[in-house]
C-alpha cells in the first residue's frame, strides 16, 4: 500500500482555551504549518488557530 497523501491535523486555539478543530491537509503541497483565524466558542471571539499533531 502507498503512503497516504492527506494527513489529519489539529488546529489549536492560541487563546489557551483548549478548544481545537480537526481537519486534514495535503502534506505534499502544504509543507508549512497552517494557521487560520477561526471562531473559538469558549473565548466567544475569532482567534488564531495553529497547527499541531494529533497524538
From Swiss-Prot:
Tagged with keyword Protease: no
A GO molecular function held by the record: structural constituent of ribosome
One GO location term (cellular component): cytosolic large ribosomal subunit
GO BP annotations, alphabetical order: translation
InterPro entries in UniProt: Ribosomal_bL33, Ribosomal_bL33_CS, Ribosomal_bL33_sf, Ribosomal_zn-bd
Gene3D superfamilies registered for this protein in UniProt: Ribosomal protein L33
SUPFAM superfamilies (alphabetical): Zn-binding ribosomal proteins
Disulphide bond pairs: none
Record keywords, A-Z: Ribonucleoprotein, Ribosomal protein
Stored NCBIfam families: PRK00595.1 (NF001860), rpmG_bact (TIGR01023)
Assigned protein family: Belongs to the bacterial ribosomal protein bL33 family.
Protein name in the entry: Large ribosomal subunit protein bL33
Organism per entry: Methylobacterium sp. (strain 4-46)
Gene this chain is encoded by: rpmG
Amino acid at each position: 500500500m502507498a503512503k497516504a497523501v492527506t494527513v489529519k491535523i489539529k488546529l489549536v486555539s492560541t487563546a489557551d482555551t483548549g478548544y481545537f478543530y480537526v481537519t486534514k491537509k495535503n502534506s505534499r503541497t502544504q509543507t508549512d504549518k497552517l494557521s487560520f483565524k477561526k471562531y473559538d466558542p469558549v473565548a466567544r471571539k475569532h482567534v488564531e488557530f495553529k497547527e499541531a499533531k494529533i497524538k
